[in-house]
Amino acid sequence: MDQIAKCIKEGTHTLFPFYDNLPDVNLFLGNSPLPSLEYGANYFLQLSRVNDLNRLPTDLLSLFTHEIMVQENDLEKVYDILNIHSVKSYGKTIKADAVVIDLSAKNKLFKKDRELIKSNNYLTENNLYISDYKMLTFEVFRPLFEMSSEKYCIIKLPTLFGRCVIDTTRVYCSLFKSVRLFKCANDSWLKDSAIIVASNACKKNIDYFMSHIRSVTKSLNWKESNNVQFSILKDSVDKEFIDKFLNFSTKVYESLYYVHSLLYSSMTSESKSIENEYQKKLTKLLL
């Protein structure tokens, strides 16, 4: 419990090694690899609790999260730390300190209003912006289409689960000589979003990678039609890299499981009131 509280209050981060050799890139647009235990068993435990929350009515979810949904200003915190004064998301001719893509649903918890679903057996979709690997689209590589002389490439990831996010991180570890992954205290600890900060570009690897990407997309420039699910590598990355990524993401998912368990207990408490012991623990932990 102390470690979870520390993780939430202080955030967590990791630095990945640089790999001079790109893995075997094989872009396919339209579908993402399916979840598997190889890429994080903790996710499946986490998903059971997410499904419990997912079936509750969204008006109740809004009521119980209204006070604990902090403003997600983790990107701004990163800008301050790195002394970044100007950012851009598009426009190769525009000059900035960093090119930034935010794939998260900022300050949002669910996708649409919904009534109670009587059991998990009737769940047909994930209505929450939590643990949804389908939210990661090929736009995660859009910065490479937009970069010119920017020092940093920054990506707000919508999730930490699945093969695709690990493969993507591994590719970035060959495109940039410094790749760090952050889950900031200023981010929402109801969601599994995180930030990649990449710097010190490796030009030869970027040129090779973009040559392959453009041959598949048949375009020199970014196209909105490419903003779809994707797979990027032919084979799984090495176990050592997967383990290093999971060492980071497991800390996040263990914290989220505890937070979501408190939230679920609060929403289903016998008191039928937002003033209950679980909600008080949540408020103390997140605010």
From Swiss-Prot:
It is found in: Virion. The keyword Methyltransferase applies. GO terms for molecular function: mRNA 5'-cap (guanine-N7-)-methyltransferase activity. One of its GO terms (cellular component) is virion component. Gene3D superfamilies: Poxvirus mRNA capping enzyme, small subunit. Its main location: virion. It catalyses: a 5'-end (5'-triphosphoguanosine)-ribonucleoside in mRNA + S-adenosyl-L-methionine = a 5'-end (N(7)-methyl 5'-triphosphoguanosine)-ribonucleoside in mRNA + S-adenosyl-L-homocysteine. Its EC number is 2.1.1.56. Keywords: Methyltransferase, mRNA capping, mRNA processing, S-adenosyl-L-methionine, Transferase, Virion. Catalyzes the last reaction in the mRNA cap formation pathway. Heterodimer of a large and a small subunit. This is mRNA-capping enzyme small subunit. It comes from Yaba monkey tumor virus (strain VR587).
